[in-house]
């Protein structure tokens, strides 16, 4: 057979399909005007439409359904055949050792639907079996669809975040927003509603994230890992990397619906929240929908696909056509990791897809079309700061994975999220104190090492310093030279393979095939050796990134040079932004904190005395931050006390000042995190939080079975909203009503298993290229190399000049 059976879940891919049935007034059964027409030969526009039609037929008759099997075309990779069966198909497998065998509803029922895709892309009912071999039981339908024995009246439609969050969860989230606005005037949040005035998506950004974005917006990762893999809480953060090489949140979202409108709303809202300044590089998963929206919202931003996202899809998209035993992964790794020029990559790619007969595979064609977004050769001139690489588990982006549990409730998620924020704050304060109070120890007499020790933070310098000892284990040989460009072969005895470095003598531009600078932002040992051989005594300015410097978080933006601001709202926002910077610096020690508070009190008195009319107003001129917009109907919104009348008890907190205190605080937070995490449901497939935050465990998530859950129907306290528009940017105190929160939803927790690269990618976030000896065809490589600056022009540099730190 040319095709391979692959189990699929169409329930998660049919959000845009019209349902042909409506619930009856009694709420007991759904009435379908068209189910009587179900017959062989019927056409449907898509497999989702056919599935929904048959599902409503099953609801009206009273039996459960399940997707039994499906097949993809070997040529195109598209689905061509789907079988849907009665939930009582098959028989139970009895074990000989069973003492008290349980009863099983399986009866070997043959009822079902077999559909196939036609040449015109439509789907036809190939075979419909109507008769069942068991008594019809209406509850079977609800058991099969929802995983629990729910009555028919409970099966109302849920949409958006209501599928993931309970009413109490939304209340908790909104209370948090209100509390944060009291504490941080710069806090920003927005709520997205659907056409039925139900919450669809939520976004928020705190004041510290705004400050961090000003310094670390050169590269941002939009992480949809938890959404794509079916986590119960659909958390989608915007991630950056600090000058201490620490994970920082630059915005957070809960995505209730994966659609073009959702991503468009989210990206535009995020851009508004950060002041309209687009990032230098945006990293996302390899996804056509995301790619289209990034181009639309950020037309001038360099868009990059996560390498692990591409690799993780190979088994899914190419499994029917290639196997790990036929050498495909080795060929793929060599093609991606060791190609130097455009021509070299294109020829290797052509040979590879020809060998494995993938010339007409649509996904492979899409990969080649988007090659500049994921192939390392085209990354010359940009830095991904450790946010991408062959494996997610070894990247900075995986740091929050320790705080996530695929089946954690919102309450558990929220507690861990708050612990994470506090932990990161303490770690940053500790790191700031360390680099201010001590100088790093040098390991060699290398001038580069001494130079960067005075510029970089301790964490960034250690990453560069780790390359220094490896220089002595490398042997350099010049292969050829043409004009201003020379090609060197580096024999790395430590890693037991060869690397190539191209050096432009005029620009002092050293491009290495290990791609450490592109992926991590630090010169590799191979480039250091080549620069030394060229008598370069100082690190070239283009390889010293301001984002790693000790002043990396003190970036002054264009608005900092005090221009006259006539609008009171703008003045308020500007002051809040500056106070956040003051808070970051003053919180490092008790003495600095007391000094800042004293000066603030004096400044307030001085401002009041300057103009007696500048009293703090009790009414008008409502101060709203973050560039938010209000609602026309303010009657919909009320004070936060209407959301919850529970008393909030303020707990005493310890004050931590010195480095030792910060370290102790970090340890306490780790222990508290483990305690909170232990209360979450425990499954074999869960990614369990680890104590050590800085060294991610190179573990992966095991493939899991479908996990079902449901919520109770309840509408109390949340009437429908008729006057709220689809998007709400939050600054008014609260939302009194959030729409109809009801119904039940099915979530399947699917974990992608990343295929083994068989050594082609070493599992390093530094990305050393191919680890297979002999994988570099030296003769072929040197023959293909074209001299001159055009040789490495895979893409234009996305780094603005102010992101570099000159000597």
Curated annotation (Swiss-Prot):
Its taxonomic placement starts with:
Eukaryota, Viridiplantae, Streptophyta, Embryophyta, Tracheophyta
Listed under GO cellular component are:
nucleus
Q: Residue ranges of the MULE domain?
A: 219-315
Per UniProt, the SWIM-type Zn-finger stretches lie at: 499-535
Q: In which tissues is it expressed?
A: Expressed in hypocotyls, rosette and cauline leaves, inflorescences stems, flowers and siliques.
Induction note? Up-regulated in hypocotyls by far-red light treatment.
From the Swiss-Prot or TrEMBL record, state where the protein is found.
Answer: Nucleus
Q: Which domain of life is it from?
A: Eukaryota
Q: Which GO terms describe its biological process?
A: regulation of DNA-templated transcription
Q: What's the chief localization of this chain?
A: nucleus
* Family the UniProt entry places it in: Belongs to the FHY3/FAR1 family.
**Its biological purpose:** Putative transcription activator involved in regulating light control of development.
Q: Which UniProt keywords apply?
A: Coiled coil, Metal-binding, Nucleus, Zinc, Zinc-finger
Q: Where do the record's region annotations for Disordered lie?
A: 788-807
Put simply, this protein is called Protein FAR1-RELATED SEQUENCE 2
Q: Which segments constitute the FAR1 domain?
A: 52-138
Using the record for this protein, list the coiled-coil segments as residue ranges, or answer none: 660-680
Q: Per the record, where are the segments of Polar residues compositional bias?
A: 788-798
Q: Which gene specifies this protein's sequence?
A: FRS2
* MF (Gene Ontology): zinc ion binding
């Amino acid at each position: 057979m040319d095709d391979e059976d692959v189990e699929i879940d169409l329930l998660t891919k049919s959000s845009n399909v019209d349902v042909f049935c409506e619930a009856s007034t009694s709420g007991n059964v759904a009435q379908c005007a068209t189910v009587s027409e179900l017959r062989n030969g019927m056409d449907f526009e898509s497999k989702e439409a056919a599935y929904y039609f048959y599902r409503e037929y099953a609801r009206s008759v009273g039996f459960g359904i399940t997707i039994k099997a499906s097949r993809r075309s070997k040529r195109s990779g598209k689905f061509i055949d789907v079988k849907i069966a009665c939930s009582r198909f098959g028989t139970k497998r009895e074990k000989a050792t069973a003492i008290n065998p349980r009863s099983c509803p399986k009866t070997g029922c043959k009822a079902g639907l077999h559909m196939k895709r036609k040449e015109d892309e439509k789907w036809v009912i190939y075979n419909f079996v109507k008769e069942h071999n068991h008594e019809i039981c209406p509850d079977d339908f609800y058991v099969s669809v929802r995983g629990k024995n729910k009555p028919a009246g409970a099966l109302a439609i849920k949409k958006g975040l209501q599928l993931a969050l309970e009413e109490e969860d939304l209340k908790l989230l909104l209370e948090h927003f209100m509390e944060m606005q009291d504490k941080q005037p710069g806090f920003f949040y927005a709520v997205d509603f659907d056409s039925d005035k139900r919450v669809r998506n939520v976004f928020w950004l705190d004041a510290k994230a705004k400050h961090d974005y000003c310094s670390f917006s050169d590269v941002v990762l939009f992480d949809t890992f938890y959404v794509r893999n079916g986590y119960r809480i659909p958390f989608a953060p915007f991630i950056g990397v600090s000058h201490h090489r620490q994970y920082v949140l630059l915005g957070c979202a809960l995505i209730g619906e994966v659609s073009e409108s959702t991503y468009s709303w989210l990206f535009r809202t995020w851009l508004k929240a950060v002041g309209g300044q687009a990032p230098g590089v945006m990293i996302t998963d390899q996804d056509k929908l995301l790619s289209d929206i990034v181009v639309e919202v950020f037309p001038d931003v360099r868009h990059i696909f996560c390498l692990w996202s591409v690799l993780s899809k190979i088994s899914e998209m190419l499994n029917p056509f290639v196997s790990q035993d036929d050498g495909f992964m080795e060929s793929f790794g060599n093609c991606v990791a060791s190609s130097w020029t455009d021509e070299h990559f294109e020829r290797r790619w052509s040979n590879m897809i020809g060998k494995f007969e993938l010339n007409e595979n649509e996904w492979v064609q899409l990969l080649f079309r988007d090659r500049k977004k994921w192939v390392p050769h085209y990354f010359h001139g940009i830095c991904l700061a450790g946010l991408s690489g062959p494996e997610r588990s070894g990247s900075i982006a995986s740091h929050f994975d320790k705080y996530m549990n695929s089946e954690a409730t919102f309450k558990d998620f929220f507690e861990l999220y708050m612990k994470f924020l506090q932990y990161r704050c303490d770690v940053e304060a500790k790191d700031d104190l360390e680099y201010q109070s001590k100088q790093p120890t040098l390991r060699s007499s290398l001038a580069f090492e001494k130079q960067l020790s005075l510029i970089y933070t301790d964490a960034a310098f250690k990453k560069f310093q780790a390359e220094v000892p490896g220089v002595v284990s490398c042997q350099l040989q010049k292969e050829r030279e043409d004009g201003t460009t020379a090609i060197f072969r580096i024999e790395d005895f430590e890693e037991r393979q060869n690397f190539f470095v191209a050096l432009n003598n005029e620009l002092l531009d050293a491009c290495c095939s290990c791609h450490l600078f592109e992926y991590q932002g630090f010169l590799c040992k191979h480039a250091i050796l080549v620069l030394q051989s060229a008598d370069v005594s100082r690190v070239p300015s283009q390889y010293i990134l301001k984002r790693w410097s000790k002043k990396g978080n003190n970036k002054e933006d264009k608005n900092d040079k005090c221009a006259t601001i006539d609008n009171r709202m703008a003045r308020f926002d500007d002051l809040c932004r500056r106070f956040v910077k003051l808070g970051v610096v003053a919180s490092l020690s008790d003495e600095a904190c007391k000094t800042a508070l004293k000066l603030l009190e004096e400044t307030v008195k001085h401002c009041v005395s300057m103009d007696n009319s500048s009293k703090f107003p009790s009414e008008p001129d409502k101060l709203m931050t973050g560039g938010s917009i209000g609602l026309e109907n303010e009657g919909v919104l009320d004070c936060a006390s209407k959301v919850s009348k529970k008393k909030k008890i303020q707990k005493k907190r310890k004050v931590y000042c010195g480095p030792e205190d910060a370290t102790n605080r970090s340890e306490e937070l780790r222990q508290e995190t483990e305690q909170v995490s232990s209360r979450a449901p425990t499954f074999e497939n869960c990614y369990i939080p680890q104590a050590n935050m800085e060294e991610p465990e190179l573990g992966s998530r095991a493939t899991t079975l479908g996990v079902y859950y449901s919520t109770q129907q309840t509408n109390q306290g949340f009437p429908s909203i008729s006057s709220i528009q689809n998007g709400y940017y939050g600054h008014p105190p609260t939302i009194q009503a959030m729409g109809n929160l009801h119904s039940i939803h099915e979530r399947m927790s699917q974990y992608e298993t990343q295929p083994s690269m068989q050594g082609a990618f070493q599992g390093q976030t530094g990305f050393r290229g191919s680890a297979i000896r002999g994988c570099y065809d030296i003769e072929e490589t040197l023959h293909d190399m074209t001299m001159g600056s055009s040789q490495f022009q895979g893409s234009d540099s996305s780094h603005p000049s102010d992101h570099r730190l000159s000597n």
